[in-house]
Amino acid sequence: YGGFSSGSMTVYLPTLFKDNYGYNTFYYVQNTGSADTNVSISYSDGTTNSITGLKPGQSKVIKQANETHSPKVFSATLQSSAAEIAVTVVEEGNTLFSYVGFGAGSPNPIMPLINQNNYGYFTGVQIQNTGASSTVVTVSYQPSISGTACTEKRTIPAGGSKTFSQFVFYQSTTETDPAFATTCTMGQTFIGSAKVTANTASMPLVSVVNQLQIADNKGGTYGAFNAADGKQKIIYPLIMDRNFGYFTSWSIVNVGASPMAAGALSNNVTVTESAG
């Protein structure tokens, strides 16, 4: 996970598990301020928890395995009383995932990589509605290497979260949402990106993307992006190639209004090698 430049008074956690196919989550809450603070925790299933007297610089762990939850997948909102906090979530099972909590949402988050039915990999996108009203969200999928453009629509209640992508490409489930609709093809290999293109109540949203390959216990997690934060220059702190069998790749989404010329990216990549 990435470090923090600052905390926030409210933190949103879109993806939490309790015994979800063997996965449980836990998260650390750190006081980044200069005064003692209390933290109230509200889960999307209606349960609550709290932290009292969290001192400056101190952190405390909250484990979902020790809490009472009916659903296996849910979300949380943390509210600090007196100082900003930072939160990191760990998803623990046969594969280890991690992501950082969100301080704010945006109406149309972007997910640069969706990887479905690709050599055993599948992707689950958890989107949390951090607003005060229910909203119907449409996610549009755009292929880059493989697949067909399609859409998926679901209702997300205020404070709650819903799983996108997984149940329209990889795994069928019983749908009870009257607003649910999709043009995606179950079982299709899809490699591309996704974006929230409709949000009926214009609620702020946050999202976490999980990619998993069960057979070899491989996976990764990242947080969705606000298009307004897009830049013309991107810095990658770690790039690997043939490093004890590891290599890296990246997915880049054009969040602007104009198309990019073919080859524009490959002609403007600079690699810096470490000394020694």
Feature roles, as predicted:
Residues 1-276:
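Gly/Pro-rich, tryptophan- and cysteine-flecked surface segments typical
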